[in-house]
């Protein structure tokens, strides 16, 4: 993993992590185009660790929201009158929504790292979840905000988030679509998607960090560069997406997703890239 590769992958991670286009799909495609073996330990560990840059960007961007929720959650542990406050409950909902992907990610880590790294899975995920995004947008009521959230909503969104372990689905695409299906408006669904991303991706990055540092082909310098680039570009991406969803439908991303899928199929069938 050289410096140029680290910069390129870091930028791709940051730009795409929170957009409903699948960062894993874009990273896998970029790795294949650069001649990397997409299921190699060095590659999978590197991409997992640089996610921490994107997550740090989310933490910085939503620092006031996070401080409010965490403070209310801890107060709710010791004060009965705080336990039912909207912010304390939101803390519990983030925890509940994180549990499904935490269990699935840990129990299925070998399948995720190897069996699901094929570009054909990327194509399937991009196309099939594009249909789900269109369906969610066209059938959603979009009348609720985060203060209307209940435990079944959080669990449902968390379960749908598990599908994002398949490259091409998109974690944000899955969770925002699920939020829309539960009747939340786009901004509320997107904000909860960001909050839900923080514990899940931070845990994945920390879990992979020790392996990445000790893996041949991954230097600490490349990890720092990739993570730094992911942070900078993710911060800008978050700010842009929140403004975008306030006035535009997620279906605007569908044509892009389908175009990427068509490109990957063409690249695979012509031998430009290999599936794994």
Curated annotation (Swiss-Prot):
The chemistry this enzyme catalyses reads: di-trans,octa-cis-undecaprenyl diphosphate + H2O = di-trans,octa-cis-undecaprenyl phosphate + phosphate + H(+)
Annotated function: Catalyzes the dephosphorylation of undecaprenyl diphosphate (UPP). Confers resistance to bacitracin.
GO biological process per UniProt: cell wall organization; peptidoglycan biosynthetic process; regulation of cell shape; response to antibiotic
Where is the protein localized? Cell membrane
Q: Which gene encodes it?
A: uppP
Q: What is its EC number?
A: 3.6.1.27
Q: Kindly list the GO CC terms recorded for this protein.
A: plasma membrane
- Name listed for the protein in its UniProt record: Undecaprenyl-diphosphatase
Residues in the signal sequence: none
Spell out the note in the miscellaneous section.
Bacitracin is thought to be involved in the inhibition of peptidoglycan synthesis by sequestering undecaprenyl diphosphate, thereby reducing the pool of lipid carrier available.
Entry similarity comment: Belongs to the UppP family.
Residues spanning the membrane: 42-62, 88-108, 116-136, 149-169, 187-207, 222-242, 253-273
């Amino acid at each position: 993993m050289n410096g140029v590769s680290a910069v390129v992958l870091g930028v791709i991670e940051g730009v795409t992590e929170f957009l409903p286009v699948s960062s894993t799909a874009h990273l896998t495609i970029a790795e294949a185009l650069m001649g990397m073996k997409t299921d190699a330990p060095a590659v999978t560990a590197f991409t997992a660790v640089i996610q921490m840059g994107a997550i740090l960007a989310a933490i910085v961007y939503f620092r006031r929201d996070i401080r409010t929720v965490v403070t209310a959650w801890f107060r709710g542990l010791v004060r009965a009158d705080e336990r039912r406050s909207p912010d304390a409950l939101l803390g519990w909902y983030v925890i509940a929504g994180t549990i499904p992907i935490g269990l699935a990610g840990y129990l299925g880590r070998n399948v995720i790292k190897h069996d699901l790294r094929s570009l054909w899975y990327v194509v399937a995920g991009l196309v099939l979840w594009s249909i789900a995004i269109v369906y969610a947008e066209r059938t959603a009521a979009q009348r609720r905000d985060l203060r209307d959230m209940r435990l079944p909503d959080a669990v449902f969104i968390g379960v749908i988030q598990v599908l994002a372990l398949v490259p091409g689905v998109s974690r944000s695409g899955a969770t925002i679509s699920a939020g829309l299906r539960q009747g939340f408006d786009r901004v509320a669904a997107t904000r909860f998607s960001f909050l839900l991303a923080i514990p899940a991706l931070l845990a994945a990055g920390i879990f992979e960090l020790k392996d990445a540092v000790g893996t041949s082909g991954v230097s600490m310098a490349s990890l720092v560069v990739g993570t730094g680039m992911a942070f900078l570009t993710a911060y800008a991406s978050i700010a842009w997406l929140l403004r975008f969803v306030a006035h535009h439908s997620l279906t605007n991303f569908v044509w892009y997703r389908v175009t990427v899928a068509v490109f990957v199929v063409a690249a695979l069938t012509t031998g430009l890239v290999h599936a794994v």
